[in-house]
Amino acid sequence: MKKMGAEVISEPQRTPDGSYAFFLKDPNGNLFQIVEGTGWFGNTGHPSQCGGVAGVIIGVSDLDKSLHLYRDVLKYETEVYDEQASFEDFYGVPGGGEVCRRVRLIHTEARKGPFAKLLGPTSIELVQTTERLEVKKIFQDRFWGDWGFIHLCFDVQGMDALKIQCEEKGFPFTVDSSNTFDMGEAGGRFSYIEDADGTLIEFVETHKVPVMKKLGWYINLKNQPHGKFLPKWMLKAMAFNRVKS
């Protein structure tokens, strides 16, 4: 990655679960953590040997309170670790030398749905600083479309049932398109909730998606049986839609 011009800001260090990870920045200053992969859809042959998104790190003000959403509602039910210290694998990032509490969550049951095999297993790590009380919310003074990360998004099936579940757990939808939102070549229903600190989480139920646009081949997922996977060959065919620089 260094040979390809990436700004690597830390060397590989062991995380609390014993695996190796390091951090780098993109040209806009966004932080990425590179971790050892546990699930692979296929080999792209890219020289970086990197896969797709495997998870996210989210800062919270009250970790125990935040677990209600991420563990109990979003079903990342297994705690890989729950530790409080100054962690060497964080030393390269701003504020990384401070004492903090970290809880990494994973889902033990494989996800189901049209794109589950492509997206693979994921994890969520919650971090609460215990030394610094003056913290900045990630969306403070930001607008949709600004450079950088916007929100965490989940591909879902059964939006109506999810809406009821979130309301019962105390996380009502703040936005709900209700019907299919037409995005031109694709379409679906989307909604948002907020965690205890106001961090945005989006749910998207895909209704229409292009498989091969040049051939006019689209697939309607609105009546797709719940939990059914799209064939692997079809998911691979979607790669021909990517924009090449």
Where on the chain are the PLM-derived regions?
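An N-terminus-focused feature that recognizes amino-terminal "leader" regions
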Residues: 1-7, 15-19, 168, 178
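Vicinal oxygen chelate
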Residues: 1-3, 20-25, 52-61, 106, ...
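Catalytic cores of nucleotide-enabled group-transfer and carboxylate-activating enzymes in metabolic
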Residues: 6, 156, 171-175
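Intrinsic, low-complexity N-terminal interaction/targeting segments
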Residues: 13-14, 95-104, 125-127, 133-138, ...
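Short, structured interface segments
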Residues: 21-45
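A short, polar/charged loop-to-alpha-helix boundary motif
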Residues: 39-50, 208-240
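Core segments of cupin and vicinal oxygen chelate
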Residues: 59-123, 168, 184, 245
